[in-house]
Structures are given as structure tokens and as C-alpha cells.
Amino acid sequence: MGGFFGVVSERDCMDDVFFGIDYHSHLGTKLAGVACYDKEIGLQRKIHSIENIPFRTRFGQVFDDMKGTTAIGCISDVDPQPLLIRTKFGAFAVYMLGKITNTDKLIEIFFNEINGHFDAKTGGKINITELVAAIINQKGNFVDGIRHLNDIIEGSASIIVIKEDGNIIAARDRLGRLPVQIGKREDGFALSFESFVLGKLGFEPYKEVKPGEIVEISSKEVTTLYEGGEQMKICAFLWSYYGYPTSSYEGKNVELMRYENGRIMAQADKKEGIAQDIDYVGGVPDSGTPHAIGYANESGKSFARAFIKYTPTWSRSFMPGTQGSRNKIAKMKMIPVKELIEGKKLLFVDDSIVRGTQLKETVDFLYENGAKEVHMRSACPPIMYNCKYLDFSASRSEMELIARRIIVELEGEEGFKYMEEYADGKTERGKKLRQSICEKFHFASLEFQSLEGLIQAIGLEPCKLCTYCWNGKE
């Protein structure tokens, strides 16, 4: 995944950008970078790995050595960014957030038809952000170039550029799958993935960039260069999983959505007659916790933290690329409260069940510490498809998805014809899917939030949400 923060100011903005990037550390653990503009020095850039050292430690001295009135910084789990590029537009810094799935075709066109070349390599592969810059450069200006990029890519791309005059151009991806939010202060403007960061640094909410919209930001004003469109497909997973609890996207707060989502799940369990006789409701931390609070409030059962995640030295474990690393980190940071586990019937809510490996270890851990029963609820529907538009999951093959693996075990690839039935817990296939996962992971019971319930909890029109990973619909 990744996140970004930038400022255009009348004064040095490096402190603001340092803290602004740090507040996006939950979105990645691999790379971080910053580019800034100073009228005397010009453009500067630094990129470092943050796999073993947190951003604030790795970049503290870096920011002390840089100065500028304009800066953008990012967390990136894909390629080193931002890049400094020199083209017919002059020198500029560029950052891209998204996922492009037809890069091989685009690279071939670039080599064969334009006789281009690339300088930046990542593990022997072409840096996708440099490819993005090369495509933009094919047109006569940034606006036409970004629109051309959106026309030919498969996937999504939000673009942020620092021009050589110190202004920022920001373009939200064509269907607005991820947010670009702007705040205003007396000395200038900031742009951010997470809305809460703007307020923490003294910026008042000013504007959410629309899907496909392109704006230019100076210290004095924000100018729309291209209006974009009305159609939106913002990622619904922002609210259920990876968005920060204090943020809002399209006016809908993450924490409140999770409370409401849990409430709807508990209500559905009551209606379907599958509410459980339990001692406590708990959340799989961190993002499962507010879903669980909502579930507990509606069910009338007490909420309790049967285990605590040790966070001072362990970062989020969904990011490391190997399953072994993810499992080890997940296990190391779980600390039990035995008095809340031993002899107890527990119901846990997790934000999602993707591969299921870590969740199995969590349930085994609870049984090892004396749990009598462990019931599980997923705050979103079964994940049936890998995302084609964003890189928020470490899964590379769809057969890593537990729902797909179970379907193949039950009736082979023929079962893929009945994905909708498997997602629905009321159908025979849906019941078999849940029963098989229960047997594999030792759950006493399992249910998933329905897609309708999830959309209701978010509170946006269904047509404005991307739900591809659950139903395969574009």
C-alpha cells in the first residue's frame, strides 16, 4: 500500500511534512521518501528503507539537513519514490499511488514506438513511477499527460508532482479509488491521504479532490485544472480495514463506520437465530476492535480484550512479503489476559479473513490459553478476488485466499461458477464454506458480514463503492 503528505507554504515546511508522513506509517513498512523545493537550492530528494527502522528514526537527520517551502513525502511498499525527473517540462518530482496491471504492454510500447529508456530500477525491474512520468511526458503539459495516463492504464494512479516553480499538481485517480484531501492554513495548503493529519498540523479542511480531478496548489490558492468526472469507485476496504480510525473519506468516518458495521452484524445474527451464548466479545486488534465494540453494544454482551497486542516495537504484520515473517510477527506481539480466556466462551470479530493463516494462529493461541469456545465473525464478506486496482494485500495469487481454497477443496474449480452462493451464508454452498473454515481453523462458529450490511455501514451509495474483491464486479 502507501500514503502521502505534502505542503506548499510561504515558509519552511519540512517539520510539517516530517510529521505528516510519519502519520501515514500504518500504510507501509518498506520504503519512505521525501522531495522538496527551495528557491535557492532547487529540488532535493531522499529515499530510504524503513523495513527495520521506523520512519521517524530513519528520517530524523534527513529532515534536519533539508529545507524547502514545498515538499511531498510518502510511504511506499512498491517502488522507491518520489523520483526526480528532467523532461521537456523541466525538472520535477513525481509520486504515484495505485496499481497499474498492464505495465508490460506499456513498457513495450514505450521501447518500440518511442525509443525511450529508463534509468530507475527496482530489483532489476523498471520503476513504475518512472514509467508514469514517461507517459505523462508524451503530451504537451502535465494536465494532458495525466489524462493520457488515465486513458491507457489498467488499474489506478493518483499522481502528485512538484513543479520547478514550487507549485504542486495533484491528480486523484480516474475513479477516485483512494482519497486526496486538501487542507488550508494561513501560510499555505497541505494535501494528504489521511484526513486527520491535516487537523493535527493546523490545517482546516478545504477540499476533497474529485475522481479524475487535477488541481494546482500554490501557497496562495488551489486551482482546478481539470474537473474530472462524477463517477466514483472508492475502495470500501478503506473503512473496514486499512483506513485510520480518526480519518474520514467522502464525509464518512472510519471509526463510526466500524461501530455501525459491528452493530449490523450482531443484528443479523439475532435475526438469523445464530447469536451465540458467549461470555465476551473481543476484537482482533487493531482494526477488528471497533467492529467488535459495535457488535458487543448491539448484542448486549460485554466487550473484553482477551489478548493485547504489544505495539511499541512491532509494526503491522500484514505488510511483510513472506508468510513466515507475517506469522512470526503476529505471534510475537500477542499477549494473553488469561483471566479473560480460561474457561470462557469468546466471540471475536476480525476486520477480514484473507489468507486465514494468522487468524488460525490467533485461535490456537486462545485455545492454548484455556478458551472453552472461540466463535469468529468477519467484518466483511468472504474475499473472492485479488484487487486489480490497489496494492493493499501481500497476496500474489488468488489461491492464497482462504475462500477460494475451500471452494476448490469442496468441488474443484467448477465451484467458481457459484461464488455468489458461497458468499451467502443462507445457501447450502455458503453453509459448507463456513463449516469447512470452522473445521480447518477450529472455530466454534463463523459468519461473514454481508455485502449489503457493509455498504449500509459505510453510508455511501453502492454505485460509488468498489467491491471488486468480494463480488468480482468492476
What role is predicted for each listed range?
Residues 1-210, 216-279, 284, 373:
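Conserved short alpha-helical segments that host acidic/polar catalytic motifs at enzyme active sites
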Residues 12-14, 102, 168, 177-178, ...:
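Flexible loop/turn segments at secondary-structure boundaries
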Residues 165-167, 172, 202-206, 363-474:
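PRPP-dependent phosphoribosyltransferase catalytic core
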Residues 172, 193, 219, 282-286, ...:
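Active-site proximal loops enriched in glycine and acidic residues that flank catalytic Cys/His/Asp
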Residues 197, 204, 212, 267-273, ...:
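Phosphate/diphosphate-binding loops
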Residues 265, 295, 351-352, 374:
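Hydrophobic, well-ordered secondary-structure elements that form the walls
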Residues 271, 276-317:
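Long, K/E/R/D-enriched contiguous segments that form extended
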Residues 297-345, 384-396:
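Short, glycine/charge-rich flexible loops or terminal/linker lids adjacent to PRPP-binding catalytic cores
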